[in-house]
Curated annotation (Swiss-Prot):
Keyword field contains Cytoplasm: yes
Compartment(s) where it occurs, according to its Swiss-Prot or TrEMBL record: Cytoplasm
Organism: Homo sapiens (Human)
GO MF: piRNA binding; RNA endonuclease activity
Bias (Polar residues) ranges: 32-46
Protein name (database record): Piwi-like protein 3
Gene name in the database record: PIWIL3
Length: 882
């Protein structure tokens, strides 16, 4: 099946009581929630997050009110008795995201790396990183003040406007994040109260209370520097879209399939403390916009609808899309369409009066709604950590004012336009280096930017940071009776083309199901399989060819018919049948139904392939991959790598959060169950929406250890866990609730015999490395390790560039060993990690993360996207999700 983009939302809870009471379940109008930005064309990691000034700006609500006539945007009620003298201390707002992780010192408990965490293996190379050293920073203590509003103001812009009325009292040298104020000099009093006036003459009391002093290098102070730096984008006329800033000045326009596309150039930045210095990390980001409103999309889809139920077809295509509202540059995910309401309907304002959506947008945003009879889009906003159990209030949007983002299915299937988009967004190392150099020079040359940074004595080096790296040797790969290595591109497909598999499984009782239109492709598949399996060592009997109607039910009914006798005899279908389904197209509902049946009710190793895939010129190569996948799903193995460790179980954990359909979150757990790393145990844990920490790890680990003991007749000595899918700010919780709990459980089994290492894997990072050759820049070769300069003294961490990319700039992966009772040396853990990147059976090449991590991702994704329930346990020892 075609790749389906993985989506993930991570947010931070913010608890603050509003002066208005929410109506239970009442939908609200647009602009009132922090939202997930749409997937970007170029895979860019999440930017460093400062505490944003606002979580839910005050906006009109459809079942009650919220809009007033505030300063520039909306107003507030007159303060009542509750706005009297406020004597209780203001609540300290916690720092969020990555800044929480910076204060977690995990290295201090690992004595074996107390003096040094730097390895020595490999060939030394000199690299450049997209980091720029801070060469000047404040040397004075800064003063943090908490800021509170009565009545509470949720709109970040309005909070800033009201505070700015008193700017002469605290001066130009200040940084405000919406909740707290950082000053270079203290106020005369620890606590002050100021009165501000909104545009409609309402009075708001602002209480400013001293919180603490901050040293220039404290994580909280660094957070303010990031907020300050983001101000520079506004001075450069960049527009904020989601969390990042983009410019329209260099927009690239394309037109395909009746849709105009626009690519905006932007940047992701962060200022953080590393081993020897504070640096500014800057990377290029792109935002893809369709010059098409949601209303245009609804009209076009309605005109092209092929079914009688036009509304259902429009809803199915629009749900899950990301739209941009240009009046506030926010992005929203469409969760539903309210066909019963239109812009002429009314909602209640905060003063109890009613206003239509048309009038609201004209008054508040100067937007004119010309189409009266259009439905309203419904967005549920974004769930936040700590508040996943609370009911979210829907946000209502007008389609005419919502601009579509991302790519349509028609565009995605057009190779020429995808290639054209990649040309503009997948920047080569040379182009990326040049673009970033231009950006840094622009900052340096802009007078307003210089003046802003000089207020805080901040100055950045304009040269890319130079860092040493080491290139490790590729792992020894054993297949058949031969040992091979990956080539310079991290691939060994040529080297193993005619070699037998390490452990080939016979293919005897198997079925090929196909629709009438796919008969030719089915016969071709059968013939190719017979020719490609012999060199692999797979013995194969002729398949039973079964023609079906092509809909999901016809596939399932046929499978039920063929498996019923086996089930009635009390036998497992897993031992009898293997299935290949040729699908007429890539309809997701058909695929999901078939996979759900074959992974839950009737567990059978299965492979689904779209007819169009078998029509390609390289059909034989594709069939070879199908045969290899089927071999793995039946319990076989393609190759193994030499790890030089004894009796060690490797575990991968990853989480999938289905934020499109608001389904449960899925944690995938995959563990090796033999010493050669060729057998695996897989289990998933279904959790609450947005939950990242896995609660049932002990159960998963026990089951995996039981399978290991069955395969090896004894327990492993060590367990090494690679944990992916963790958001910023979760490091301490991960250490307490997963790493230490697993260690405690292992001690209950055998207090002295088990050792554990727990490694956090992070793919979504902004750091890039360049290898310079003369005046040119290239990607570092696979196996490049960086464990100095851009690592942290408090962590046992390192980067590895494990994969090779044909287009664009390679993204390294960051590893952080947060718990280790094994005593892994830097060279050992780096070499092991790189070796495991050779063990993903879907590709004869090196991948970006260790194989157990990627297996866990594939498992969680299949369950979260297609199955939506726990797979049958009889499949747990098979890689059925490849």
């Amino acid at each position: 099946m075609p790749g389906r983009a993985r989506t993930r939302a991570r947010g931070r809870a913010r608890r603050r009581e509003s002066y208005q009471q929410e109506a239970p379940g009442g939908p609200r109008a647009p602009g009132s929630a922090t939202t997930q930005e749409p997937p970007q064309l170029q895979s860019t990691p999440r930017p460093l997050q400062e505490e944003v000034p606002v979580v839910r700006p005050l906006q009109p609500r459809a079942a009650r009110g919220g809009a007033g006539g505030g300063a520039q945007s909306q107003g507030v009620k007159e303060p009542g008795p509750e706005a009297g003298l406020h004597t209780a201390p203001l609540q300290e707002r916690r720092i969020g995201g990555v800044f929480q992780d910076l204060v977690v010192n995990t290295r201090q408990d690992m004595k074996h790396v107390k003096d040094s965490k730097t390895g020595s293996e490999g060939t030394v190379v000199q690299l450049l990183a997209n980091h720029f050293r801070v060469i000047s920073r404040p040397q004075w203590v800064a003063y943090k003040y908490n800021v509170d509003y009565k009545p509470d103001i949720e709109d970040g812009n309005l909070r800033t406007i009201l505070l700015d009325q008193h700017r002469r009292k605290f001066g130009e040298r200040h940084i405000f994040d919406g909740n707290s104020l950082l000053l270079s000099r203290p106020l005369k009093e620890r606590r002050v109260e100021w009165l501000s006036t909104t545009k409609d003459k309402n009075i708001v009391k602002i209480t400013v209370e001293f919180s603490k002093e901050l040293t220039p290098t404290s994580p909280d102070c660094l957070r303010y520097y990031n907020i300050l730096f983001r101000r520079t984008f506004k001075l450069l006329d960049f527009e904020q879209v989601g969390r990042n800033y983009y410019t329209k000045k260099k927009a690239i326009q394309l037109y395909r399939h009746g849709t105009s596309l626009e690519i905006w150039l932007g940047y992701v930045t962060s200022v953080l403390q590393y081993e020897n210095s504070i640096t500014l990390c800057a990377d290029v980001s792109h935002k893809l916009l369709r010059i098409e409103t949601a209303y245009d999309f609804i009209k076009r889809t309605s005109a092209q609808a092929q079914t009688g139920n036009i509304r259902e077809e429009v809803t199915n295509k629009l749900i899950g899309s990301i739209v941009l509202t240009k009046y506030n540059n926010k992005t929203y995910r469409v969760d539903d369409i309210d066909w019963k309401q239109n812009p002429e309907d009314t909602f209640n304002k905060s003063d109890g009066s009613k206003i239509t959506y048309i009038d609201y947008y004209r008054q508040q945003h100067k937007e004119i709604v010309t189409v009266k009879k259009q439905p309203l889009l419904v967005s549920q906003g974004r769930w936040k950590k700590g508040l996943t159990g609370t009911q979210r209030e829907p946000i209502l949007l007008i389609p005419q004012l919502c601009h579509m983002t991302g790519l349509t299915d028609e565009i995605c299937k057009d190779y020429s336009i995808v290639k054209e988009l990649a040309k503009h967004t997948r920047l080569s190392p040379r182009r990326r280096h040049h673009t970033l150099k231009e950006f840094i020079n622009t900052l340096q040359d802009n007078k307003k930017v210089r003046e802003l940074l000089q207020l805080w004595d901040l100055k950045f080096d304009t040269n890319f940071l130079s860092v040493p790296g080491r290139v490790l040797k590729n792992a020894n790969i054993v297949q058949g009776r031969r040992m091979v290595k990956a080539n310079s591109q991290g691939d060994w497909s040529r080297e193993i083309r005619e070699l037998p598999l390490l452990n080939a499984m016979p293919l005897h009782s198997w079925l090929i199901l196909y629709s009438r239109s796919s008969h030719r492709e089915a016969m071709s598949l059968k013939g190719h399989l017979q020719s490609v399996t012999a060199p692999m060592g797979i013995t194969m009997k002729p398949a039973e060819m079964i023609e079906v109607d092509g809909d999901a039910n016809s596939y399932i009914d046929t499978l039920r018919k063929y498996t019923r006798p086996t089930l009635q005899m009390g036998m497992s279908c897993l031992l009898v049948f293997k299935v290949i389904c040729i699908l007429p197209n890539d309809d997701k509902r058909r695929y999901d139904s078939i996979k759900r049946y074959l992974c839950t009710k009737c567990p059978i190793p299965s492979q689904c392939v779209v007819k169009k895939t078998l029509e390609k010129v390289q059909a034989r190569t594709i069939v070879t991959k199908i045969a290899q996948q089927m071999n793995c799903k039946m319990g076989g193995a393609l190759w193994k790598v030499e790890t030089d460790v004894q009796r060690t179980m490797f575990v991968g954990i990853d989480c999938f959060h289905d934020i499109v359909n608001r389904q449960k979150s899925i944690a995938g757990f995959v563990a090796s169950t033999n010493a050669e790393l060729t057998k695996w145990y897989s289990q998933c844990v279904i959790q609450k929406t947005g939950e990242e920490l896995v609660k049932e790890l002990e159960i998963c680990l026990k089951a995996a250890l039981d399978v290991w003991c069955k395969n090896e007749s004894s327990m492993p000595h060590s367990v090494i866990v690679y944990r992916d899918g963790v958001g910023d700010g979760q490091l301490q919780a991960l250490l307490d609730h997963e790493a230490k709990k697993m260690s405690t459980y292992l001690k209950t089994i055998s207090p002295n015999n088990f050792t554990l290492a727990f490694i956090v894997v992070k793919k979504r990072i902004n750091t890039r490395f360049f290898l310079k050759h003369g005046s040119n820049f290239q990607n570092p070769p696979p196996g490049t390790v960086i464990d100095v300069e851009l690592t942290r003294n408090e962590w046992y961490d390192f980067f590895i560039v494990s994969q090779s990319v044909q287009d664009g700039t390679v993204t390294p992966t960051h590893y952080n060993v947060i718990y280790d009772t094994i005593g892994l040396s830097p060279d050992t853990v780096q070499r092991l990690t790189y070796c495991l990147c050779h063990m993903y059976y879907n590709l004869p090449g090196i991948i970006r993360v260790p194989a157990p991590c990627h297996y866990a991702h594939k498992l969680a994704y299949l369950v979260g996207q297609s199955i939506h329930q726990e797979p049958n346990r009889s499949l747990s020892t098979r890689l059925f999700y490849l």
